[in-house]
Regions:
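An aromatic/glycine/proline-enriched structural segment found at the starts
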Residues: 1-42, 48-52
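A generic secondary-structure signal for well-formed alpha-helical elements
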Residues: 2, 6-13, 72, 125-132
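Active/ligand-binding-proximal structured segments within catalytic/core domains
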Residues: 46, 56-72
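M16 family metallopeptidases and their MPP-like homologs
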Residues: 1, 41-55, 78-144
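Generic hydrophobic, helix-prone segments enriched in Leu/Val/Ile
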Residues: 21, 64-71, 111-112, 118
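Active-site phosphate/pyrophosphate- and oxyanion-stabilizing loops and adjacent acidic/basic residues
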Residues: 75
């Protein structure tokens, strides 16, 4: 059905290409609050971004880090601390228009748990930067 519809659309005969409209992430730390609804609930989103040498190997490394962080933060924030139902993590290696990456971590929690859970998140990041990644977590990511 879609093919029939799309196939019947007229062609404009023009060639199109993408255009860089200059959208970029803000510099530094940005904190925003929005108050909506009646029930108190917080949504925490931490985004890291920066320059990135785009390659298949680097994209794989970024994806593997995404998998490790997903497991570690689920274990700590959800299972150990009981502070959230789930942690969502996604990493984006970006090739065009500029080579960069974005690494997103997001979770919902009660407003009174925001600081505690955010500190635990950054403690895990510091731990990985200082001590590296335990081989058990690498094995778990490879099993996925």
């Amino acid at each position: 059905m879609v093919e029939t519809y799309l196939g019947s659309l007229p062609s404009t005969g023009r060639s199109e290409t993408w255009q860089n409209v200059g959208i970029k992430m803000p510099d530094g730390i940005v904190e925003n609050s929005a108050i909506k609804g009646i029930d108190p609930k917080s949504m925490v989103r931490v985004i890291f971004n920066g320059d990135f040498e785009y390659s298949k190997e680097n994209s794989h490394i970024l994806s593997s880090l995404e998998g490790v962080m997903e497991i570690k933060l689920r274990e700590i924030l959800r299972e150990d601390m009981g502070g959230t139902y789930g942690v969502w993590i996604w990493a984006d290696p970006i090739h065009y228009p500029n080579e960069k990456y974005e690494f997103n971590i997001m979770f919902g929690c009660a407003p009174e748990n925001v600081d505690t859970l955010t500190q635990a998140l950054f403690a895990q990041i510091d731990s990985i930067q200082t001590f590296g990644i335990d081989i058990d977590y690498i094995s778990k990511v490879q099993e996925k």
